[in-house]
């Protein structure tokens, strides 16, 4: 069996031995006296003997080390005392003075673990076998199974704080507030009612989106939520699923025998009729399986039609969830069609959009019509609905001063959720810009047709949305597209509600694969597989530009946008430049050169 190599620690100990300086008086006594090779006598360095016997190999190493140390010091001949006096000094070192001395090493091992005990040779250790090469140092960091592996391979109980940080980074989740629960990793871990989980499975929802992962656990704790996320991130289910879970926990006797038909238990507010209808469709899909009725209150419909709908809801004693726009809802309350005295669950979707559209006063009026928060836990309603306060969920793309005002006025200790790069350049949208130095309507129309035709050739089943700022421009574009055999539909404020719904349905089903619209359709309409958005006219507010192009590139798909600009759009150039830079997108050369005065 071959001899073991010498431990590096022991070699370093030998190399670290400090030479002992011999005073002149002792050197004189040890010399042979004057005249006997006195001129050639050199200074002798004495090294203390090591107590560790390393064998012949170690001796050779020690001799070499000592020789190396002595060779680095010049061999000085004896000289007159006058020339040596200024060099006469003596070091007096303590262990604490050694810069390499560490009384509390990062890792401390017992000597017998390493096979060395009381300075014994490695070859003389207790076991003296080759298996000693595989030592288990018992490092707690190396052997902590909780710190090994990705979070997706662990049980929920094994998740560490580090795992949760990585999880949130993976899904772009940021939160703000006190004692916010962890996001859910899957539907099964969400805590939702089993019937809701079964519905999710039957509808093919395999995994929650980031906003759903973050929002649902907070809502299930009956805590107010402010979610900052873009349209298309899955916000609808983020608030509908906790809402349905809440309804499933309401006292059964109240639901079956005491509930009044026109007293909804939950209210969802939306800025536009289109978004309200979209939310209604999603809520009805789940509500039918769970036994809850959904009613939409939007403009363009007769009040009698709404009343008939409520009366015809045979199952479940009337309406449970109301979805609508603020103005129409206020009218319905004033006409006694609806009563919100039992409505303890409020959702405001795209709240910033409602503020922009002038609904701030209507919002305040509606919220004040809801039951108050004070001392709910001591009331009968608190026991029936298992609540201590009213529950409010608000979703917005930006946190503006009016939004902050509403939050401070009506929400209690809310948890803030920020998803991904809300407000930042969208990574999966390829943005193109065409700057027209001279305004020529004919040239712009010609380029528009070429862009649409080129995109259609590359993507035969493509859905395209074209935005303009004015209704008459939309009508002109629609005629121009028809003349070039490009089927399209138009949506703007002058269209009736029935015409708008029919146009959207034709667009969704690809019967008319091009939609021409004003900003009324820019927010809230969730049409899958839109591959191109064209801004025939740049929006007057830059935020609207973000909402427009957000119609494409959804659910992880790639999308394109094409925007025409001219000098009249100069107010949007600076925010556009910052927007592109923040998202590490290419800034057009003309935008770099443009003199933004």
Swiss-Prot record:
<feature type="binding site">
    <location>
        <begin position="229"/>
        <end position="236"/>
    </location>
    <ligand>
        <name>ATP</name>
    </ligand>
</feature>
<feature type="region of interest" description="Disordered">
    <location>
        <begin position="21"/>
        <end position="83"/>
    </location>
</feature>
<comment type="similarity">
    <text>Belongs to the DEAD box helicase family. DDX23/PRP28 subfamily.</text>
</comment>
<dbReference type="InterPro" id="IPR001650">
    <property type="entry name" value="Helicase_C-like"/>
</dbReference>
<feature type="region of interest" description="Disordered">
    <location>
        <begin position="116"/>
        <end position="140"/>
    </location>
</feature>
<dbReference type="InterPro" id="IPR011545">
    <property type="entry name" value="DEAD/DEAH_box_helicase_dom"/>
</dbReference>
<keyword id="KW-0507">mRNA processing</keyword>
<dbReference type="GO" id="GO:0008380">
    <property type="term" value="P:RNA splicing"/>
</dbReference>
<keyword id="KW-0067">ATP-binding</keyword>
<dbReference type="GO" id="GO:0005524">
    <property type="term" value="F:ATP binding"/>
</dbReference>
<dbReference type="InterPro" id="IPR014014">
    <property type="entry name" value="RNA_helicase_DEAD_Q_motif"/>
</dbReference>
<keyword id="KW-0347">Helicase</keyword>
<dbReference type="InterPro" id="IPR027417">
    <property type="entry name" value="P-loop_NTPase"/>
</dbReference>
<dbReference type="InterPro" id="IPR000629">
    <property type="entry name" value="RNA-helicase_DEAD-box_CS"/>
</dbReference>
<dbReference type="GO" id="GO:0006397">
    <property type="term" value="P:mRNA processing"/>
</dbReference>
<keyword id="KW-0547">Nucleotide-binding</keyword>
<dbReference type="GO" id="GO:0003676">
    <property type="term" value="F:nucleic acid binding"/>
</dbReference>
<comment type="subunit">
    <text>Component of the U5 snRNP complex.</text>
</comment>
<feature type="short sequence motif" description="DEAD box">
    <location>
        <begin position="349"/>
        <end position="352"/>
    </location>
</feature>
<feature type="domain" description="Helicase ATP-binding">
    <location>
        <begin position="216"/>
        <end position="417"/>
    </location>
</feature>
<dbReference type="GO" id="GO:0016887">
    <property type="term" value="F:ATP hydrolysis activity"/>
</dbReference>
<keyword id="KW-0963">Cytoplasm</keyword>
<feature type="short sequence motif" description="Q motif">
    <location>
        <begin position="185"/>
        <end position="213"/>
    </location>
</feature>
<dbReference type="GO" id="GO:0005737">
    <property type="term" value="C:cytoplasm"/>
</dbReference>
<dbReference type="Pfam" id="PF00270">
    <property type="entry name" value="DEAD"/>
</dbReference>
<feature type="domain" description="Helicase C-terminal">
    <location>
        <begin position="444"/>
        <end position="595"/>
    </location>
</feature>
<keyword id="KW-0539">Nucleus</keyword>
<dbReference type="InterPro" id="IPR014001">
    <property type="entry name" value="Helicase_ATP-bd"/>
</dbReference>
<feature type="compositionally biased region" description="Polar residues">
    <location>
        <begin position="39"/>
        <end position="80"/>
    </location>
</feature>
<comment type="function">
    <text>ATP-dependent RNA helicase involved in mRNA splicing. May destabilize the U1/5'-splice site duplex to permit an effective competition for the 5'-splice site by the U6 snRNA, resulting in the switch between U1 and U6 at the 5'-splice site. May also act to unwind the U4/U6 base-pairing interaction in the U4/U6/U5 snRNP, facilitating the first covalent step of splicing.</text>
</comment>
<dbReference type="GO" id="GO:0003724">
    <property type="term" value="F:RNA helicase activity"/>
</dbReference>
<dbReference type="Pfam" id="PF00271">
    <property type="entry name" value="Helicase_C"/>
</dbReference>
<protein>
    <recommendedName>
        <fullName>Pre-mRNA-splicing ATP-dependent RNA helicase PRP28</fullName>
        <ecNumber>3.6.4.13</ecNumber>
    </recommendedName>
</protein>
<keyword id="KW-0378">Hydrolase</keyword>
<dbReference type="GO" id="GO:0005634">
    <property type="term" value="C:nucleus"/>
</dbReference>
<keyword id="KW-0508">mRNA splicing</keyword>
């Amino acid at each position: 069996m071959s001899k073991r190599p010498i431990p590096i620690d022991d070699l370093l100990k030998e190399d670290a031995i400090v030479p002992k300086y011999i005073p002149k008086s002792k050197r004189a006594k040890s010399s042979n006296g004057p005249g006997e090779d006195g001129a050639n006598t050199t200074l002798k360095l004495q090294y203390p003997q090591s107590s560790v016997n390393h064998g012949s190999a170690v001796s050779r190493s020690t001799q070499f080390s000592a020789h190396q140390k002595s060779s680095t010091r010049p061999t000085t001949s004896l000289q007159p005392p006058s020339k040596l006096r200024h060099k006469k000094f003596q070091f007096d070192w303590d262990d604490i003075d050694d810069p390499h001395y560490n009384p509390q090493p990062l890792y401390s091992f017992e000597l017998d673990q390493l096979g060395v005990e009381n300075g014994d040779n490695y070859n003389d250790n207790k076991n003296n076998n080759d298996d000693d090469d595989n030592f288990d140092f018992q490092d707690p960091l190396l052997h902590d199974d909780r710190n090994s592996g990705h979070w997706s391979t662990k049980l929920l109980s094994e998740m560490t704080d580090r795992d949760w940080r990585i999880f949130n980074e993976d899904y772009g989740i940021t939160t703000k507030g006190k004692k916010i629960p962890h996001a859910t990793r899957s539907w099964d871990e969400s805590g939702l009612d089993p019937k809701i989980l079964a519905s999710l499975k039957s509808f093919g929802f395999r995994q929650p989106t980031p906003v759903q992962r973050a929002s649902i656990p907070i809502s299930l704790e009956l805590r107010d939520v402010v979610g900052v996320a873009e349209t298309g991130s899955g916000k609808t289910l983020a608030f509908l699923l906790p809402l349905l879970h809440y309804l499933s926990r309401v006292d059964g006797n109240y639901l079956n025998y005491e509930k009044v038909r026109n007293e909804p238990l939950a209210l969802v507010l939306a800025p536009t009729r289109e978004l309200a209808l979209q939310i209604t469709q999603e809520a009805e899909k789940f509500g039918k399986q769970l036994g809850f009725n959904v009613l939409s209150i939007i403009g363009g419909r007769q009040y009698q039609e709404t009343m008939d709908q409520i009366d015809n809801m045979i199952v479940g004693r009337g309406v449970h969830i109301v979805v609508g726009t603020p103005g129409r809802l206020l009218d319905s309350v004033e006409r006694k069609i609806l009563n919100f005295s039992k409505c303890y669950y409020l959702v405001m979707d795209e709240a910033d959009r409602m503020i922009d559209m002038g609904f701030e006063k209507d919002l305040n009026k509606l919220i004040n019509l809801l039951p108050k928060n004070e001392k709910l836990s001591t009331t009968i309603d608190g026991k029936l609905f298992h609540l201590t306060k009213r529950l409010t969920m608000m979703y917005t793309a930006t946190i503006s001063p009016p939004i902050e005002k509403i939050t401070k006025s009506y929400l209690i200790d809310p948890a803030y959720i920020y998803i991904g790069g809300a407000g930042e350049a969208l990574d999966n949208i390829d943005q193109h810009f065409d700057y027209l130095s001279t305004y020529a309507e004919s040239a712009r129309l010609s380029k528009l047709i070429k862009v649409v035709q080129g995109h259609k050739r590359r993507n035969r089943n493509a859905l395209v949305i074209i935005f303009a700022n004015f209704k008459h421009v939309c009508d002109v574009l629609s005629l121009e597209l028809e003349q070039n055999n490009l089927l399209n539909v138009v949506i703007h404020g002058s269209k009736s509600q029935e015409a708008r719904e029919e146009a959207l349905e034709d667009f969704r089903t690809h019967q008319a694969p091009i939609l021409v619209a004003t900003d009324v359709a820019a927010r809230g309409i969730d049409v899958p597989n839109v591959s191109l958005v064209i801004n025939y006219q740049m929006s007057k507010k830059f935020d609207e530009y973000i909402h427009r192009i957000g119609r494409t590139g959804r659910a992880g798909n790639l999308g394109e946008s094409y925007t025409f600009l001219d000098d009249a759009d100069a107010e949007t150039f600076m925010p556009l430049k910052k927007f592109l830079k923040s998202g590490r997108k290419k800034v057009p050369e003309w935008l770099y050169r443009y003199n933004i005065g």
